[in-house]
A protein has these predicted regions:
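A short, charged/proline- and glycine-enriched loop
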Residues: 1-6, 54-56
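Active-site nucleotide/adenylate-binding loops and adjacent lid/helix of ATP-dependent enzymes
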Residues: 2, 8-10, 79, 87-170
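Conserved N-proximal alpha/beta basic substrate-recognition cap immediately N-terminal to
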Residues: 10-113
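Short, charged N-terminal helix-start/capping segments
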Residues: 43-44, 169-171
Length: 171
């Protein structure tokens, strides 16, 4: 019987656009390598984590669901070893990562972070933006429409409105 029991939690398919197979393969390879070293590894979905089915004190994960991150953070606070910390994953959401990098003077493309339901045309014009990229602020790309190149401030406003209608609050 293995002395070390590890939970390996798969990333939800919604957060693996065009890469579901790749992400699953990565986690399976990690699990297999741990098993070769004598560990017992149980693979779970994010839904199973959220449902409370994970009891192991060591967790390797690829989670991205907001609720999953909250659970991972709680487990980490309670003394579990969480590889891919829920706190670290949360810091990799686009808006938070942008703020951290810019605030730490790490070179990063000039950025404006806005609410998708606000009028931004005048702000873009005064900042000198003409062509630019608009990216969802909450997560990295989940659909190809989550990253949009626009040619002028009016088009930027239209794209932000589309994001708002899709439930994306920040870009």
């Amino acid at each position: 019987m293995a002395e070390i029991k590890i939970a390996a939690i798969k990333r939800s398919g919604a957060f693996s656009p065009n890469h579901i197979g790749n992400d699953t393969a990565i986690l399976n390879i990690v699990a297999e390598q741990l098993r070769k070293r004598g560990c017992e590894v149980n693979i779970y979905s994010e839904d199973e984590l959220i449902a409370g089915k994970v009891s192991e004190r060591i967790i390797v994960n690829m989670c991205r669901e907001h609720r999953s991150l909250e659970i991972l953070q709680k487990k980490e606070d309670d003394g579990c070893l969480v590889i891919n910390s829920g706190y670290g994953i949360e810091n990799c959401t686009r808006e938070r990562m942008t703020r951290i990098l810019v605030g730490s003077n790490i070179p990063y493309p000039e950025s404006l972070i806005v609410s998708t339901n606000e009028a931004v045309r005048d702000r873009l014009v005064s900042a000198g933006y003409t062509r630019c990229w608009i990216k969802r602020g909450d997560y990295h790309t989940m659909h190809r429409e989550d990253v949009s190149h626009v040619r002028h401030p009016e088009e930027a406003q239209e794209v932000l409105q589309e994001y708002f209608m899709r439930g994306i609050k920040r870009a």
